Swiss-Prot record:
Gene responsible for this protein: hisZ
Protein's UniProt name: ATP phosphoribosyltransferase regulatory subunit
Keyword Acetylation: no
Gene Ontology CC entries for this record: cytoplasm
Alphabetical keyword list: Amino-acid biosynthesis, Cytoplasm, Histidine biosynthesis
Subunit structure: Heteromultimer composed of HisG and HisZ subunits.
Function: Required for the first step of histidine biosynthesis. May allow the feedback regulation of ATP phosphoribosyltransferase activity by histidine.
UniProt record similarity statement: Belongs to the class-II aminoacyl-tRNA synthetase family. HisZ subfamily.
Matches recorded under InterPro entries: aa-tRNA-synth_II/BPL/LPL, HisRS-like_core, HisZ
Amino acid sequence: MRWVLPDHIQDALPAEADKIERLRRRLLDAFRSHGYQLVVPPLLEYLDSLTTGAGQDLKLRTFKLVDQLSGRTMGVRADMTPQVARIDAHLLNRRGVSRLCYCGSVLHTLPSTLTATREPLQLGAELYGHAGLDADIEIIRLLAEVMRLAEVPASRIDLGHVGLFRVLAARAGMVPGREEELFDLLQAKDLPDLHALVAGVAEPVRSALLALPGLYGGAEVLDKARVCLPDDAEIREALDDLSRLAAALGDLPVSFDLADLRGYHYHSGVVFAAYGGGSPAALALGGRYDRVGEAFGRGRPATGFSLDLRELAVRLADVGQPGAILAPAGGDAALEALVAQLRSRGEVVMTELPGHDGSWNEAGCDRQLIRREGRWTVESLQGE
């Protein structure tokens, strides 16, 4: 069956494709109005460039192939964030703040969930060159605006900080392999296996690691964290950052999840996840990743977010736009002038082709151009 697509790969048919494109234009225009400049990275690069500074998860999600010109291993991008970091660090080479945005397909070897596509249409925004919380606040507010424009207002924005995990893992003496296991258990909030893994860790770090999965909810979480986490300068700084963010974003539905560590391999500070539209999974993910550019010769403070445009477009309401107008074929100058005028006003006008016996309603036409008393007029098109 030559028409069958691989699992978790889908076509976008006209109705869905129209939603995706309308939403893409709307969101990129919003980025532009905030000063974010569009970049278009290539679909594939040398593998070491695509996965530099990333964790094992990104490497496993990346399709690999051999470049027939150089013989080097290439990868099809699974995430555009490292590509944009490369552009900022190596190509633009700006000294001040740089605001960049992007939209393009990425490809995953495996779906992230049972129902997820393996070809998300990734859209995102990144802010480089400012280490202060003002940059994080700008990015989170931009994300909230994007979700509002997509007609899926954020019902919850969870904030976390990977610095908490890094400090506790270091103080627990976790080697890289065990740290990965600890990360997985915290993400899954698997308390029985977490108890077993940290059984030999000294106090107070052991109790702190066991407390992390329960540190989620409202502002009271930060007060609780100050009590049950060690009195460490880096931990205090991370909690202070989260407190200041919560105060600055008081008009948004902000909550906290201190065990949410997605992307911790390259994130370096505040992380966040946005939920909405009744989805149990996060619709957008983001955070600070100050060290990613180091692999490209220029480490810069950076923060940003990304989302799957397809996932948002599914939730976009039908706008009830008028259908197309059917125009008869022919060389009538008045007709051609009217067709051009209608198209300039945003109307869709299809020209009838000789011998076509299909349904014009099926093709999207609900009106037609009819000549009445020497003048062309737009009238309702009756179904065939």
